[in-house]
Amino acid sequence: MRAFTQHQGTVAPMDRSNVDTDMIIPKQFLKSIKRTGFGPNLFDELRYLDEGKPDQDCSNRPLNPDFVLNQDRYKNASVLLARTNFGCGSSREHAPWALDDFGFRVIIAPSFADIFYNNCFKNGLLPIVLDEKVVDRLFRETEENEGYQLTVDLEAKTVTTPGGESFSFEVDDFRRHCLLNGLDDIGVTLEDADTIRAYEESRRKTAPWLFNTGN
């Protein structure tokens, strides 16, 4: 998993509440568990004018010109600005996979669905909760200023505007540690590899029958 310390990126505004995981990545794309390749189908039903199919070449599909990610000013966005209850619905982990594969590193919203919020951290995405009034302001500034960027500092737990104003956010210390060091669940376990090996050696001496592999 990629480590996250600080990120500066263009902001794309997703101006709707209750964006669910089926909207983020529709159900027909959930057969794969590779974690990659979902970016072209992110927000598929909003992004394209036709119906998406698994393993389809998306390069020639008709685009919805009104959808935010199809607008030139937002095509390279890596910070998604969203509304309340982002990521609600089913618990599919494909949703953060698709956001990450598209190129997003940060999602900012007034609130997130709990399971989606947890899944983001497990997949290298940083979900940030800011006060709704602050989010409203960021929406206005994003729409008024082409190329609007935010700087997110996970060490300092701040979001900073181009004008230099910073907003603080909260994040659990353990999740912060994992993101700063690029640790997924396996990586966290491997941090204690020496302790685990020492325990296994101790158990071989105190309970050797547990390790008897003979026929």
Swiss-Prot record:
**GO CC terms of this entry:** 3-isopropylmalate dehydratase complex
One short Pfam family name for this protein?
A: Aconitase_C
Q: What does this protein do?
A: Catalyzes the isomerization between 2-isopropylmalate and 3-isopropylmalate, via the formation of 2-isopropylmaleate.
Q: Which InterPro entries match?
A: 3-IsopropMal_deHydase_ssu, Aconitase/3IPM_dehydase_swvl, AconitaseA/IPMdHydase_ssu_swvl, IPMI_Swivel, LeuD
Q: Which family does it belong to?
A: Belongs to the LeuD family. LeuD type 1 subfamily.
Please give the SUPFAM superfamilies that the UniProt record associates with this protein.
LeuD/IlvD-like
Alphabetical keyword list: Amino-acid biosynthesis, Branched-chain amino acid biosynthesis, Leucine biosynthesis, Lyase
Q: What is this protein called?
A: 3-isopropylmalate dehydratase small subunit
Recorded GO molecular functions are: 3-isopropylmalate dehydratase activity
Pathway listed for it is: Amino-acid biosynthesis; L-leucine biosynthesis; L-leucine from 3-methyl-2-oxobutanoate: step 2/4
Q: Which cysteines are joined by disulfide bonds?
A: none
Query: What Enzyme Commission number(s) does the record list for this chain?
Result: 4.2.1.33
Q: What catalytic reaction does the record list? A: (2R,3S)-3-isopropylmalate = (2S)-2-isopropylmalate
Q: Which Gene3D superfamilies is this protein grouped with? A: Aconitase, domain 4
Q: Name one GO biological process term.
A: L-leucine biosynthetic process
Q: Where on the tree of life does the source sit, at the highest rank?
A: Bacteria
Fill in the subunit field for this protein. Answer: Heterodimer of LeuC and LeuD.
Q: Say which enzyme class the record assigns.
A: lyase
